[in-house]
Amino acid sequence: MPTAHQELGVFGEQKVVQKCACPKCKRSRTLVRLPTNFKCADVICDFCGYLGQVKAARVKDITKIPKAVLGAAWKPQKERMDAAIYFPLFLVLASENLKQHAIYYLAADLQKPELFRPRSPLSKNARRAGWQGFIYETDQARNSFVRLF
């Protein structure tokens, strides 16, 4: 049974593939979801191979980007950053009941290391002890996001 956060993630990915054209080749309906737990990417264009990350958050006002959004695993993100590889970000903001949503886009070339803040590793008593995630400090790039829908 998926958690509320997992359901929100699927919701965000579904909205991106339903509504967004590929930012690289500009074709409609070519973005498809990648398998769950694919590292650092959630969608791929089945025409040109473009990869993108999707993050979703519940907010009170879908017109305002929150100051921070939960990311994913820190280690693979850090390894890619060290290699100067960044994936474009689709940020899906949804109302509490998911009736309203907005999709924002942040291009890879507008991302800087300051956008990513590592979280503290999970405690030794946690189910996934030692796992470390990160937070997108969206305040660092607020003016670079473009609203698509």
List the model feature ranges, each with a label:
Residues 1-51, 55-149:
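Nucleic-acid endonuclease domains
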